[in-house]
Amino acid sequence: MTNIRKTHPLIKIVNHSFIDLPTPSNISAWWNFGSLLGLCLIIQILTGLFLAMHYTSDTMTAFSSVTHICRDVNYGWLIRYMHANGASMFFICLYLHVGRGLYYGSYIYFETWNIGIVLLFAIMATAFMGYVLPWGQMSFWGATVITNLLSAIPYIGTSLVEWIWGGFSVDKATLTRFFAFHFILPFIVAALVMVHLLFLHETGSNNPSGLISDSDKIPFHPYFTIKDILGVLFLTLTLMTLVLFSPDLLGDPDNYTPANPLSTPPHIKPEWYFLFAYAILRSIPNKLGGVLALVFSILILMLSPILHTSKQRSMMFRPLSQCLFWILAADLFTLTWIGGQPVEHPFIIIGQTASILYFSIILIILPLVSSLENKLLKW
């Protein structure tokens, strides 16, 4: 009798995706982040669902409802901090996942890559709206500043901002719609993840060498399910250590003050995972220019397949490109640091230099160095 997992219409899909999936035998731990992102999404949806049962999206009660969750709901503090720090773990895994894709040339599968970038935008939008919900000082002012950026769009900007706000400032209407979108977006993200996997399984996984690995593939289960469990243990350990020992480490103290439209915090800044983009935004003195730079700092990833000039897919055998990649990584750390600093000397010039370097490496230097490596290979 044929095994049910190979014949049943539903189980067959799971089988082809996670059990009998032919996987390159040499993929490293950098390929663990896909499954970890799936785990993060599940954690976020489950904790978010339980938080939504007790949260009220009204400006008068939002802040106190979060306080009520932490004080009065059974393990409410645990659910709240798992959700808040789970977002941080989500973005750590996301950035490492994208970095892996850039390093090993995974962007050559451009449908998978582009859907991944759409996913990145969707998750960023979800996280931004989630940060507004506790209705603390940084929630309110962060929402005001970031939504106000849309007013830089010529002609329709001001009307667009007021339409998003649902009034003439960030208020009850804004909070209610942000809660609605924050609730629905993770499910849209889950659907996009399915499409992401669909396209990935059309081509099969890339591997560290960047070479075709059809002749050397092994089943996903048990080899990589076991390998993924190690990543799951590390992720769970890190998340729970953060939640149980220092839950506010990555948060902002200003968000423990209820939102007050009459008092502006001295330094308005988003969560740490948006600081690199925020630094790029602030480094351009023109409002519209800053907004465009902010959008293109992520959108530029879509150009990776076009800008690939090397004859080799992966950076594994390209030492010059490797150096550039790690300079880019250091540059992103610098931008993250600058995004959290006040707008004054020397931070302004450091931010501007780091922003120029970020775009230069991706658009100009990396393609040129890749071409040079092609020439060196012929010698």
Curated annotation (Swiss-Prot):
Q: Which InterPro entries match?
A: Cyt_b/b6_C (IPR005798), Cyt_b/b6_C_sf (IPR036150), Cyt_b/b6_N (IPR005797), Cytb/b6-like_sf (IPR027387), Cytochrome_b (IPR030689), Cytochrome_b_C_euk/bac (IPR048260), Cytochrome_b_N_euk/bac (IPR048259), Di-haem_cyt_TM (IPR016174)
The record's annotation in PROSITE patterns points to: CYTB_CTER, CYTB_NTER
Q: Name one GO biological process term.
A: mitochondrial electron transport, ubiquinol to cytochrome c
Predominant location category: mitochondrion
Binding, heme b b566? H97, H196
Q: Where in the cell is it found?
A: Mitochondrion inner membrane
Single GO molecular function: ubiquinol-cytochrome-c reductase activity
How is this protein situated with respect to the membrane?
A: Multi-pass membrane protein
Pfam hit, one: Cytochrom_B_C
Q: How is the cofactor bound?
A: Binds 2 heme b groups non-covalently.
Please give the superkingdom of this protein's source.
Answer: Eukaryota
Cofactor entry: heme b
Q: Where does a ubiquinone bind?
A: H201
Disulfides per UniProt? none
* Annotated Gene Ontology cellular component terms: mitochondrial inner membrane; respiratory chain complex III
Instruction: Quote the SUPFAM superfamilies the UniProt record gives.
Output: a domain/subunit of cytochrome bc1 complex (Ubiquinol-cytochrome c reductase), Transmembrane di-heme cytochromes
Q: Where are the transmembrane segments?
A: 33-53, 77-98, 113-133, 178-198, 226-246, 288-308, 320-340, 347-367
Keywords of this entry = Electron transport, Heme, Iron, Membrane, Metal-binding, Mitochondrion, Mitochondrion inner membrane, Respiratory chain, Transmembrane, Transmembrane helix, Transport, Ubiquinone
Q: Which residues bind heme b b562?
A: H83, H182
Q: How does it assemble?
A: The cytochrome bc1 complex contains 11 subunits: 3 respiratory subunits (MT-CYB, CYC1 and UQCRFS1), 2 core proteins (UQCRC1 and UQCRC2) and 6 low-molecular weight proteins (UQCRH/QCR6, UQCRB/QCR7, UQCRQ/QCR8, UQCR10/QCR9, UQCR11/QCR10 and a cleavage product of UQCRFS1). This cytochrome bc1 complex then forms a dimer.
Tell me more from the record: Heme 1 (or BL or b562) is low-potential and absorbs at about 562 nm, and heme 2 (or BH or b566) is high-potential and absorbs at about 566 nm.
UniProt lists the family membership as follows: Belongs to the cytochrome b family.
The record's function comment reads:
Component of the ubiquinol-cytochrome c reductase complex (complex III or cytochrome b-c1 complex) that is part of the mitochondrial respiratory chain. The b-c1 complex mediates electron transfer from ubiquinol to cytochrome c. Contributes to the generation of a proton gradient across the mitochondrial membrane that is then used for ATP synthesis.
Q: What is this protein called?
A: Cytochrome b
